[in-house]
Amino acid sequence: MENAKMNSLIAQYPLVKDLVALKETTWFNPGTTSLAEGLPYVGLTEQDVQDAHARLSRFAPYLAKAFPETAATGGIIESELVAIPAMQKRLEKEYQQPISGQLLLKKDSHLPISGSIKARGGIYEVLAHAEKLALEAGLLTLDDDYSKLLSPEFKQFFSQYSIAVGSTGNLGLSIGIMSARIGFKVTVHMSADARAWKKAKLRSHGVTVVEYEQDYGVAVEEGRKAAQSDPNCFFIDDENSRTLFLGYSVAGQRLKAQFAQQGRIVDADNPLFVYLPCGVGGGPGGVAFGLKLAFGDHVHCFFAEPTHSPCMLLGVHTGLHDQISVQDIGIDNLTAADGLAVGRASGFVGRAMERLLDGFYTLSDQTMYDMLGWLAQEEGIRLEPSALAGMAGPQRVCASVSYQQMHGFSAEQLRNATHLVWATGGGMVPEEEMNQYLAKGR
């Protein structure tokens, strides 16, 4: 972006100056509305989410057999919700800032099949596509036992079709493993940030991995192009997919059930704050949408991004959405949080969700490494750097009197609050790689 344009952007949006300086930044969204006001802009409804629930239930018998690690939950891919009191104390000590309320962790990092939040959206979209093809071919009805999809005739049928996706790693992992299991030919276009072990794991499942020297945006574009030339190839579009988004949104109702099981209350007197790491936006956007449908105006969602890849904060704050990238303002999009290394946010998610999100913040790679180490020490839970992005959120909220006033929170409401950090990945990181992460914390 040329200087004059940049200066006028900063004049209009002074916060951009802090982003450019790679400062850890927090922006509480003045444009938040109630669910009732914000919902029409999403373009999706509660019924769409119910349909996704139903589809995943139809596939549960198949998943339970195809992936024995899901058998215990009857083929439902869901993660644990745990309290992390020792980590809460450690954060308070390290940052000299109390966290009022209780700190919880949602362990999507340990979801079965692919060990990340992408096991929600990625797997769902592959299943939805497989179902559509099988229904259209007359090989399946909605009332069938879907475990029949494991038979050789279905494998044969699906092998005529292929799937392509662009990814920094975790989405590719979930889509690759699922597609290969069903019988699709699958190609994952991986950006320069993708970890070597993720590529190796995909190849071990018979997935074709195409590697790029450039970032996520290029990998997605190339994947899109390659798929266009083949009528039997379906491209999963992480930047714009409503199907992926709905796969993530199912998490809302499920979390509500987990809260009920644990006797946790969410209402006006007991607010819920949720902190979601954000790359291109589909995962956190879908989850936040589901949470809003489940808990209404009593849940407050925040997106967390690396200082080097603040694409969603930049897009929503300036109102330019996918018309601006972090590279346009001179930020390099290079971060240890490979899952969040995205320079241009999803325009669909930004426009759909900007009224339903309470805020956005950035944190440095070093902060992620520090918290990664503390969590391993205090709670024995090991995550990848991206998954710690949410962990900085509770203190930003508790430290901001202006945010608390904007929403009229009393001291008592904050004492009764639940702070939920969404851990997005790390359950399948190889030991030696994890040791390198741990060595970088202070």
UniProtKB/Swiss-Prot annotation:
Name the UniProt key words of this record, in alphabetical order.
Lyase, Pyridoxal phosphate
According to the UniProt entry, what is the EC number of this protein? 4.3.1.18
PTM N6-(pyridoxal phosphate)lysine: list the residues. K118
Its domain of life reads Bacteria
Any one biological process term the GO annotation gives:
isoleucine biosynthetic process
Q: Which reaction does it catalyse?
A: D-serine = pyruvate + NH4(+)
Cysteines paired by S-S bonds: none
What InterPro entries is this protein classified in?
D_Ser_am_lyase, Ser/Thr_Dehydratase, Ser/Thr_deHydtase_PyrdxlP-BS, TrpB-like_PALP, TrpB-like_PALP_sf
Among Pfam families, the record links this protein to:
PALP
Report the GO molecular function annotations: D-serine ammonia-lyase activity; hydro-lyase activity; pyridoxal phosphate binding
Please name the top-level EC class of this enzyme.
lyase
Look up the record and name the cofactor or cofactors this protein needs: pyridoxal 5'-phosphate
Its assembly, as annotated, is:
Monomer.
The Swiss-Prot or TrEMBL record describes its family as follows: Belongs to the serine/threonine dehydratase family. DsdA subfamily.
PANTHER family recorded: D-SERINE DEHYDRATASE, THREONINE DEHYDRATASE, MITOCHONDRIAL-RELATED
Protein name, as recorded: D-serine dehydratase
